């Protein structure tokens, strides 16, 4: 339940809410108002060690629970999430700032991830081949790996944790969760509902905090695997440090997602698609469209319509259903984004829609409106860097080949989209683009939970992505058995 009182956030270890053993805390503001809504502990190493010990103890029995029973337990959790969808969405809007519409969509995507986890009995099935040699049978069996951990970002405080711990737990592991210190309240509610569903103590543990918690997770010898979603520099650090310490690591990193707009596209739907991808959730998502490569033949018409429609978007508190763009997560991030907009102007790009100039009614929140640049090139920081904001760069290209070449020049390769009505164009794009997730007339090509989620190049460090069969393989180890009976 959402209240107006300032909350002091706790950790959840071994089935109980406990104060951090440390004394350092960080204020959590509502991004739409700047007012403090909570204080979150910056937990020390000792709290992580306690959480790992609890998870180790729980693993001894949880890993032995029959797979269908674990699945049934998750069904109870799934039901509770569905029953509390409205409350969960409101918590997201309160502490993250995204509009209630966007938050509601996130809640549904998180629920879909839990639906995948309930199907673990099917996904964990092994393989067998009888009579591989005279009187000898061969088979592959999947087993849980032990205590695993997840480190998640602020921008999807429900969906991304639910990519991780339900599937890991369904596979028989126990879990230590470290969510962003910027959005601790939703994490609390997810854990409350988890134990309300009747799970044994210690199966899921929540440690709030910052860098010290991350480092403690990466260094703890009893944690077998780490899942991470966040920025490219931190993802690289998590991958290198975790693997150096003998852990299995999947680290989903930054992005600079491109869309190629072809002359044969459906103009109206393409414009609305680009707006939704670039500006919804205030652009704070790793699958947001941040660069449009538009073919010269349609460029002027596309840009005219895009600019006109973008100028209609309202900016403000996410609880107001008339608003399309909510606040950014923090004042410091707002200042960083304004710096990028200023650099684009200084570098010679044409500012078609200026998000620095927004209505005064938005108040004291961390607001930047939808922003569009034209005349952008690959030498500009606004093309090169992940800005993580409602800032869109337009590059004009002569044809599909140049659009693909431009897209592949980015160091990132998370998602990419083509807008076209030509199947051959779509096929050429699919076969030649570097991105790990590709959309054809799909604005945000983030796959459903039963498909793997992972980019390429500097957008992903590791081998197996989250979700789908990749997720099951990541959270299990296989044993190959060759047997003969006399």
Swiss-Prot record:
Enzyme class, broadest EC rank: oxidoreductase
CDD domains in alphabetical order: ALDH_F6_MMSDH
Keyword Oxidoreductase: yes
Pathway it works in: Polyol metabolism; myo-inositol degradation into acetyl-CoA; acetyl-CoA from myo-inositol: step 7/7
Binding-site residues, NAD(+): 154, 178, 181-182, 231, 386
Record GO terms (molecular function): malonate-semialdehyde dehydrogenase (acetylating) activity; methylmalonate-semialdehyde dehydrogenase (acylating, NAD) activity
Catalytic activity: 3-oxopropanoate + NAD(+) + CoA + H2O = hydrogencarbonate + acetyl-CoA + NADH + H(+); 2-methyl-3-oxopropanoate + NAD(+) + CoA + H2O = propanoyl-CoA + hydrogencarbonate + NADH + H(+)
Enzyme Commission designation: 1.2.1.27
Keywords, ordered alphabetically: NAD, Oxidoreductase
Residue numbers annotated as active site: 286
One Gene Ontology term from the biological process aspect of the record: valine catabolic process
Keyword ATP-binding: no
Superkingdom of origin organism: Bacteria
UniProt function note: Catalyzes the oxidation of malonate semialdehyde (MSA) and methylmalonate semialdehyde (MMSA) into acetyl-CoA and propanoyl-CoA, respectively. Is involved in a myo-inositol catabolic pathway. Bicarbonate, and not CO2, is the end-product of the enzymatic reaction.
Family affiliation: Belongs to the aldehyde dehydrogenase family. IolA subfamily.
Record note on quaternary structure: Homotetramer.
Protein name: Malonate-semialdehyde dehydrogenase 1
């Amino acid at each position: 339940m959402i209240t107006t009182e300032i909350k002091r956030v706790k950790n959840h270890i071994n089935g109980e809410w406990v104060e951090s053993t440390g004394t350092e805390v960080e204020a959590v503001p509502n991004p739409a108002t700047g007012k403090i809504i909570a204080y979150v502990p910056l937990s020390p190493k000792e709290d992580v060690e306690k959480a790992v010990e609890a998870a180790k103890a729980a693993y001894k029995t949880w890993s032995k629970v029959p797979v269908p029973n674990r699945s049934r337990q998750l069904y109870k959790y799934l039901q509770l999430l569905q029953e509390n969808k409205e409350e969960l969405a409101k918590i997201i809007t309160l502490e993250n700032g995204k509009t209630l519409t966007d938050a509601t969509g996130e809640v549904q995507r998180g629920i879909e991830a839990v639906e995948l986890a309930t199907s673990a009995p099917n996904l964990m099935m092994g393989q067998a081949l009888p009579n591989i040699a005279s009187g000898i049978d061969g088979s592959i069996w999947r087993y849980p790996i032990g205590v695993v951990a997840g480190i998640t970002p602020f921008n999807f405080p429900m969906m991304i944790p639910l990519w991780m711990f339900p599937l890991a737990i369904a596979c028989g592991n126990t879990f230590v969760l470290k969510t962003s210190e910027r959005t601790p309240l939703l994490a609390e509610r997810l854990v409350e509902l988890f134990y309300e569903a009747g799970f044994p103590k210690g199966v899921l543990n929540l440690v709030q905090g910052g860098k010290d918690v991350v480092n403690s997770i990466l260094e703890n010898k009893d944690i077998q695997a780490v899942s991470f979603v966040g920025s490219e520099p931190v993802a690289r650090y998590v991958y290198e440090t975790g693997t150096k310490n003998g852990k299995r690591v999947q680290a989903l990193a930054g992005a600079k997602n491109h869309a190629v707009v072809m002359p044969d596209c459906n103009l109206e739907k393409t414009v609305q698609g680009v707006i939704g991808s670039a500006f919804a959730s205030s652009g704070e998502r790793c699958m947001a469209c941040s660069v449009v490569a538009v073919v010269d033949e349609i460029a002027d018409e596309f840009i005219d319509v895009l600019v006109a429609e973008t100028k209609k978007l309202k900016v403000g508190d996410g609880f107001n259903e008339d608003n399309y763009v909510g606040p950014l997560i923090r004042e410091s991030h707002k200042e960083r984004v304004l710096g990028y907009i200023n650099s684009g102007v200084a570098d010679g790009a044409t500012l078609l829609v200026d998000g620095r100039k927004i209505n005064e009614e938005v108040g004291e929140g961390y607001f930047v409106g939808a922003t569009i640049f034209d005349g952008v090139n690959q030498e500009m920081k606004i093309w090169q860097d992940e800005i993580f904001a409602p800032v869109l760069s337009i590059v004009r290209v002569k044809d599909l080949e140049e659009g693909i070449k431009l897209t592949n020049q980015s160091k990132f390769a998370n998602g990419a989209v083509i807008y076209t009505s030509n199947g051959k164009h779509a096929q050429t794009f699919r076969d030649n683009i570097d991105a790990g997730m590709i959309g054809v007339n799909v604005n945000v090509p983030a796959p459903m939970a039963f498909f793997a989620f992972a980019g390429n190049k500097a957008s992903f460090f590791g081998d197996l992505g989250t979700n789908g069969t990749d997720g099951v393989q990541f959270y299990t180890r296989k044993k190959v058995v060759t047997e003969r009976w006399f």
